[in-house]
Amino acid sequence: MGAQVNAAELLQQALSSNIIPNQEFLLQGSILDSAAENLLHRLRGLCDNVDASPETFSDIEMCFSLKLPTEKTPVMTVRVRRAQDVEAPLQLRYIGQPELGDRTRPTLVRSSLDIACTPHVIDFLTEMGFRLDFEYSTKGYMFRKGRMKITVSKILKNMTEPISQSYLVELSVLAPKGQDAIAEDMRIFAEQLKPLVQLEKIDYKRFAQMP
């Protein structure tokens, strides 16, 4: 019991001290397959460890939602990510709604929590009432520039079939609350990728309202 109380106190102290990276800054865009190699070449020149080959990844991502019988929309949505190419823990991820905030802010900002888990996390979610909505695979390249992470990836269905003839490009940073200055650094970096790719704040609510 004492250990549980101590763990709860430590977590509360971490939250109050703003040392937990629970906020994601995000810009997204896409680039045609025919131009992707040019973007990868540009990123090799701009990012850290330019002498090494970019890190590759191949993941399966599953989206689970928890719904109440009286509600049409899910009360909570979480994602489970599993690496296909390396032995690594599964990642349980909660992603919140984008903050409204200042419309002049250069990036989208949303709550985000990532937790390493055992393979039993899927059974755990099912027991809690979560249901699998959909799953997909991603395969691509990852670069780093300081705290910034840049991924260039293909989204696949059935693990092998691309859903489009373009790559998804994402620029993101996980940081504690109160570090909004990183958004300006991301904007400056994104400018260096033009005109190859236009990284923007994506308004998903606008897509949901489309007929």
Curated annotation (Swiss-Prot):
Gene Ontology biological process: positive regulation of transcription initiation by RNA polymerase II
UniProt GO cellular component terms: core mediator complex; mediator complex
Top-rank taxon: Eukaryota
GO molecular function, one term: transcription coregulator activity
Gene3D superfamilies found in the cross-reference section: Hypothetical Protein Pfu-838710-001 (2.40.320.10)
Record key words, sorted: Activator, Nucleus, Transcription, Transcription regulation
Subcellular location: Nucleus
Main location: nucleus
Described purpose of this protein according to its UniProt entry: Component of the Mediator complex, a coactivator involved in the regulated transcription of nearly all RNA polymerase II-dependent genes. Mediator functions as a bridge to convey information from gene-specific regulatory proteins to the basal RNA polymerase II transcription machinery. Mediator is recruited to promoters by direct interactions with regulatory proteins and serves as a scaffold for the assembly of a functional preinitiation complex with RNA polymerase II and the general transcription factors.
Family of this protein: Belongs to the Mediator complex subunit 18 family.
Subunit field text: Component of the Mediator complex.
Protein name: Mediator of RNA polymerase II transcription subunit 18
Organism: Anopheles gambiae
Gene: MED18
